[in-house]
Amino acid sequence: MAEVNGDFPVPSFADGTGSVSAGLDLLVERSIHEARSTEPDASTQLTIIFGGSCRVFNGVPAQKVQEIIRIAFAGKQTKNVTGINPALNRALSFSTVADLPIARRRSLQRFLEKRRDRSTKPDGSMILPSQLTIIFGGSFSVFDGIPAEKVQEILHIAAAAKATETINLTSINPALKRAISFSNASTVACVSTADVPIARRRSLQRFFEKRRHRFVHTKPYSATTSEADKNETSPIVT
């Protein structure tokens, strides 16, 4: 029975109160807790990026991640980019040109900038080291110059320590991106003309017919000719 409070009726429940029963509250709270417990914990997810590929391991303990980071730190070979090419050091060690005339100083500055740009271009003697990125628990670590053998060892350790199936992502390879974009372009080019308006579709069909007609007749040593062309080229007998 509903009780009237002023002008608005207040519903009464089985327990005699004007609110939802405690049993229903516990049921809703338990359902929400179960739904949250089924979601993957992002804090135990380990992501390793190396050589254009990305691999995700779920359920890796923090102690195992610390071991992986120690292995990566011991195997890194960080180099100073400035010290790789001696020509770059010579270009940076030039004395100041503030005491030269303005026109000559600007010309010399442009010359030094061009020389520095040429020196910093990558060549056979300036190879950038491989980079390993480890993401875990909302933080990431980047290591330069990690050998591929050391990365394979790290991947084996992470795979052995994972609690669930590994996710292999190959979405950051430039060659794969180009292949996907080319595939998408080909798919768009092969879309049917059924969704084109009627007038435009007919015009497009005539265009393709004329194009095929020109291709057949301009192709050298073509043995296929249409009946209409034979009738047009045959002499008229009166």
UniProtKB/Swiss-Prot annotation:
The entry's keywords: Jasmonic acid signaling pathway, Nucleus, Plant defense, Repeat, Transcription, Transcription regulation, Ubl conjugation
Residue span of motif Nuclear localization signal 1: 103-110
InterPro entries tied to this protein: CCT_CS, TIFY/JAZ, Tify_dom
PROSITE patterns recorded: TIFY
Record PTM: Ubiquitinated. Targeted for degradation by the SCF(COI1) E3 ubiquitin ligase-proteasome pathway during jasmonate signaling.
Location of the region described as Disordered in the Swiss-Prot/TrEMBL record: 219-238
Top-level division of the source organism's lineage: Eukaryota
Residue numbers covered by motif Jas 1: 101-120
Description of its domains: The jas domains (101-120) and (197-222) are required for interaction with COI1.
Homology family: Belongs to the TIFY/JAZ family.
Name this polypeptide is given: Protein TIFY 3A
Biological classification of the source: Eukaryota, Viridiplantae, Streptophyta, Embryophyta, Tracheophyta
The gene coding this protein: TIFY3A
